[in-house]
């Protein structure tokens, strides 16, 4: 077990089942052993867990968190935090404003809940979700799912067996040939877009990217029940 609580402190646990924690500002924490846990809670802190089943968490302002081992979990909750889980079945979550979350392993899950956040799942059957306003979500793996639920969010499907869901008000979606796009048709006062409880769901529609009626790599939106190509 390793712990550094002072400002600018560094903490490292490399043995199996080790635990590492750095709670001071600018602190760094690393646990590379199997089942290791790493946590950096200070401002601008960095946390990394590379061992099998490792867990990594960075909760401070601009914190960075990375879990590269199998079944690893990574979470960055601070403002502009970055979270990455590259191992098999890894989970990555960034909840801060403008946070970035990426899960590249098979069955990985990636979630960005802050406004302007970015979420990407590239592994087989990965799931990617961006719930903040103007958030971007992308699923590039086979059978993956991408969802953007915030106002004017972006959702993209980069594989033929992937679904992109544009569920947020005024959200857009695109995909490659063979993929499916799902849209929610909302009615509401756009000047008060930040009040989702005032939106009214009029319906939903799913289309397949066939390369003709619905073009590849082209943004689409839904208006009055009709899926339309977005005019930038």
Regions found by a protein language model. Give the residues of each.
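Intrinsically disordered, low-complexity terminal regions
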Residues: 93, 156, 163-232
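Thr-biased low-complexity repeat/linker tracts and other Thr-enriched repetitive architectures
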Residues: 1-156
């Amino acid at each position: 077990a390793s712990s550094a609580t002072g400002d600018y402190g560094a903490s490292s646990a490399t043995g199996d089942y080790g635990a590492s924690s750095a709670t001071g500002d600018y602190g760094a924490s690393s646990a590379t052993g199997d089942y290791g846990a790493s946590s950096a809670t200070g401002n601008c802190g960095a946390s990394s867990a590379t061992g099998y089943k490792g867990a990594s968490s960075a909760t401070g302002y601009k914190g960075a968190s990375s879990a590269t081992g199998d079944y690893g979990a990574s979470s960055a909750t601070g403002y502009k935090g970055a979270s990455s889980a590259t191992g098999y079945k890894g989970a990555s979550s960034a909840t801060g404003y403008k946070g970035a979350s990426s899960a590249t392993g098979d069955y990985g899950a990636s979630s960005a809940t802050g406004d302007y956040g970015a979420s990407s799942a590239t592994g087989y059957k990965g799931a990617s979700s961006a719930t903040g306003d103007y958030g971007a979500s992308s699923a590039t793996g086979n059978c993956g799912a991408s969802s953007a639920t915030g106002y004017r969010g972006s959702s993209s499907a980069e594989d033929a067996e992937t679904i992109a869901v544009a569920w947020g008000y005024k959200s857009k979606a695109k995909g490659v040939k063979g993929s499916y796009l799902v849209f929610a048709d909302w009615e509401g006062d756009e000047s008060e877009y930040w009040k989702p409880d005032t939106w009214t769901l009029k319906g939903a529609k799913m289309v397949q990217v066939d390369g003709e009626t619905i073009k590849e790599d082209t943004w689409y939106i839904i208006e009055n029940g009709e899926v339309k190509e977005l005019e930038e």
